Structures are given as C-alpha cells and as structure tokens.
A protein has these predicted regions:
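Conserved SGNH/GDSL esterase-like catalytic core that processes O-acyl groups on lipids
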Residues: 1-79
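Conserved beta-strand segments of alpha/beta enzyme cores
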Residues: 2-7, 94, 136-138
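Active-site segments of SGNH/GDSL-like serine hydrolases
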Residues: 48-51, 60, 84-119, 144
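Surface-exposed, active-site-proximal loop segments in enzymatic domains
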Residues: 54-69, 105-113, 153-157
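Alpha-helix N-cap and loop-to-helix initiation/capping positions
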Residues: 64-75, 112-123, 159-164
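Acidic carboxylate-rich catalytic motifs and surrounding loops in phosphoryl-/glycosyl-chemistry enzymes
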Residues: 96-101, 136-154
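Substrate-gating cap/lid alpha-helix
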Residues: 105-142, 167-169
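Histidine-centered active-site loop/cap adjacent to the catalytic His
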Residues: 134-138, 154-179
Length: 179
C-alpha cells in the first residue's frame, strides 16, 4: 500500500490542552486538521513532550496544586485520549500515538530536576500504554529505542535536546508494519 504523508502541526500543543473540558485554540486547530484528512486514514499523533519539561507542565502543576504528579499525568492522558476518540468518530481514522522519547540529560540543570523530568516521561509513557487500549488506538514506541542509562536519552536518535532525527524511522517502520 502506498501512503502519502502530510504533516499537520499544532504548535505548542500539550496533552493538557486536549484533556480540558473548555474549548481552546489548540482543539480548534486539531479539529480542522483531523477533518482535513481523508476518512479512514492512518494518522500519527505526537503530544506530551512539552507537558513533561521541567519548567512547565506536570512538574510545575503538581507543585502548584500540591497534587501527586502521577494523578495529574493519569487524568491528563486519559482525558486527552478520550478527546481524540470523540473527535475521530466521524472520520474513522486509524490513529497511532507516539510515546515520548527519553529526555536528553540537561547539563544546565541539577540531578534532581533531570531525574524529575525523566520520571515524568516514564510516567506519561506508562499511563499512555495503559489508557490507549481503551480507545483502539495504536502505540508507536520510540522510548525503548531512545532510552539509555538512568532513564535518559542514549543520544543516538536525538537531533537536539528535544527532537528526534530521521534515524528513528528505521525503528518506527517495523512497528507500523506489524500492526
């Protein structure tokens, strides 16, 4: 089967934005993207990396709200998947979610902050794997290929401190073929 790849980007989107009941611009843009893709298409979605950064998202919210980070991540992952499921009903896309790559150890930050970021990514991926099966979505695992010592990036697939290089495609393609 031949496929035509068309990137659709929602800049700055977090899983958090899709987990909230209230309307927001991220949801609007994503709805337009979902509707613009021919029905019954293979759709790949990657959100959550920004949510797991040490200076925003779950780590900051857990401190501010004095709530366990596990609770925030679990609810956010569950609700954002539910949002995508609801907005895919009319389109009937086969949706594939990427989990998060292991974070690159940031030498500008101390060990505790780096450990918190690595733990947050691991928790996000764990809850994503748990909740994704409830929606008949597929999981593309990039974490297992990017994780090295202590939960941090092995620096083989990262092109910079946050983004993966095209080298990761050799690990993604077999996962897609086996679905």
């Amino acid at each position: 089967t031949q496929y035509h790849v068309v990137p659709k980007i929602v800049y700055g989107a977090k899983a958090y934005h899709f987990s909230k009941k209230k309307h927001n611009s991220y949801k609007t843009i994503m709805k337009v993207h979902i509707a613009s893709i021919p029905k019954n298409s293979e759709v790949f979605i990657s959100v959550g990396e920004i949510d797991c950064r040490p200076d925003e998202g779950f780590i900051v919210a857990a401190k501010k709200r004095n709530k366990p980070i596990e609770e925030l991540i679990s609810i956010t992952v569950k609700e954002h998947l539910k949002w995508f499921s609801e907005h895919n009903k009319d389109q009937n896309h086969n949706i594939h979610f990427f989990n998060l790559p292991a974070p690159v150890y940031d030498k500008k930050l101390d060990k505790v902050i780096n450990a918190n970021a690595a733990n947050t990514v691991a928790l996000f991926n764990m809850f994503l794997a748990q909740h994704i099966v409830l929606h008949d979505f597929n999981l593309i695992d990039v974490y297992k290929f990017t994780v090295g010592k202590n939960g941090f990036s092995n620096n083989f697939f990262h092109i910079d401190n946050r983004h993966l290089s095209p080298k990761i495609i050799t690990e993604i393609e077999p996962q897609i073929r086996n679905m």
